[in-house]
Amino acid sequence: MRAAVAHRILLSLALFAVLCRCDPDLLFDYCVADTAAATAAGAFHLNGLACIDPALARADHFATSALSRATNPAATLYGFNATLTSPAASLPGANAQGLAMARIDLAPGGMAPPHSHPRASEAALVLSGSVLVGFADTSYRLYTQLLRAGEAFVFPRAMVHFLYNMDTAAPAVVLSGLNSQSPGAQLVPFSAFRTEPRLPDEVLKKAFKITGQDVQRIQKHLGGL
């Protein structure tokens, strides 16, 4: 009897694990996004966009130049810009494939501040520059590595991580791959100080051991006031 119960529990856990994968598997070879349907008023929000007729698919649906264009991150709050591929805008052939790519431009001394991707793991490859990367796990252990051009690093799914251009004279460029077409991004500073509506000041004061004036100052510096 106990063996039968244990078997049912293990089977249930196995099925649950399958259902909790990042993105669902395709039932076809590909599902090129119908970008017209994606922008239509009242369009449904799905894990992936509606597909066009496979007979209408073209090679350029599976190609993009979106990541070839450099951006100027110098004027941004943290000195970084991230360009993410999107089935609706730049890479319709990636629809429902469970992946996205990103180009991160880092100004000299710029940083992608501590953040997480709740729905994806990330593999980051440095194309140019010297970039200090790292993540903290759920036991608050920190893993860091200084990467140079041609070197890569993996950020496990949902772990808080950062990328910091150590060079104060030259920019850096990083190319990332993520195993979800909708990885999400949650910046830690904004999650604490830029929510709408705002977190209560008392919560922030107690959590960070700061004063009410500190809360106001940080919110102002983050452009939240």
Swiss-Prot record:
It is found in: Secreted, Extracellular space, Apoplast. Mn(2+) binds at H115, H117, E122, H161. One of its GO terms (molecular function) is manganese ion binding. Disulfide bonds join C31-C51. It holds the Pfam family Cupin_1. Glycans are attached at N81. One of its GO terms (cellular component) is apoplast. PANTHER family: GERMIN-LIKE PROTEIN SUBFAMILY 3 MEMBER 3. May play a role in plant defense. Probably has no oxalate oxidase activity even if the active site is conserved. Belongs to the germin family. This is Germin-like protein 3-1.
